[in-house]
Amino acid sequence: MAFQPIIDVVERKVLAQEALVRGAAGEDAGFVLSQISDDSRYAFDQLCRTTAIDLAAGLGLAGDGALLSINFLPNAVYEPRACIRQTLLAAGRANFPLQNILFEFTETERVDTAHLLGILNAYRAIGFKTAIDDFGSGYSGLRLLAQFQPDFVKIDMDLVRDVDTDRAKRAIVANVLRKLHDLEIAAICEGVETVDEYRCLRNLGVRLMQGYLFAKPAFAALAEPTWP
């Protein structure tokens, strides 16, 4: 498992460390997930959660106030409160504050909306923070926002890429940012790779970013960001 920071570029600090699944030879999450059968999704999802908490706590994340961001599979959760027990046990063992755990899910995964809302509301009641990942690349982003407002929305890297030179992308990102501001949801732009993209996003008012410009994922370590 690797960690990549999410940066507050205004305060120049790490807001969160995102736990990223990696294979034994460094394969990315997409490859690893493609090897998981439907029957194994629940066990895999549970293992990823507890491993992320154990590793992050061992690296000192629990004590520095930053969030731990964990990606979860909504279709692997059959009943929210039953499926969260191992996560709560792991957090308890590690003395990891529940309010410092952020659960991300991607809108590209087809999932029953009522089921997803049940998960998100249960997690919020426990004290976890929530985020929609890859916003703008999936099926139901705006419709979901009408029913549930997460703490964060991560704008998809395909919209961020070349935002400084692509007028259409810039207009779309600006529009999404206005909607999120109206809903009091914090925006995170992911996949920021160039100084020009960074400057364009700053001009649009973005303060939370993630990408290779700041730090690449670090295997079993907390990557230290560099600043443009």
Please place each PLM-identified region on the residue numbering.
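Bacterial c-di-GMP phosphodiesterase EAL domain
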Residues: M1-A94
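EAL-family c-di-GMP phosphodiesterase catalytic domain
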Residues: D8-K13, T106-R110, Y139-P228
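EAL-type cyclic di-GMP phosphodiesterase domain
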Residues: A24-L47, N75-A82, G92-G127, D158-K179, ...
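Solvent-exposed, well-ordered amphipathic alpha-helical segments
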Residues: L55, A62-D64, E79-C83, T87, ...
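Short, flexible, glycine/charge-rich loop motifs used to bind or transfer phosphoryl groups or to couple energy/partner
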Residues: G58, A91-G92, N121, L142-L144
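Structural preference for beta-strand elements that scaffold enzyme active sites
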Residues: G65-S69, N100-E104, G127-A131, F152-K154, ...
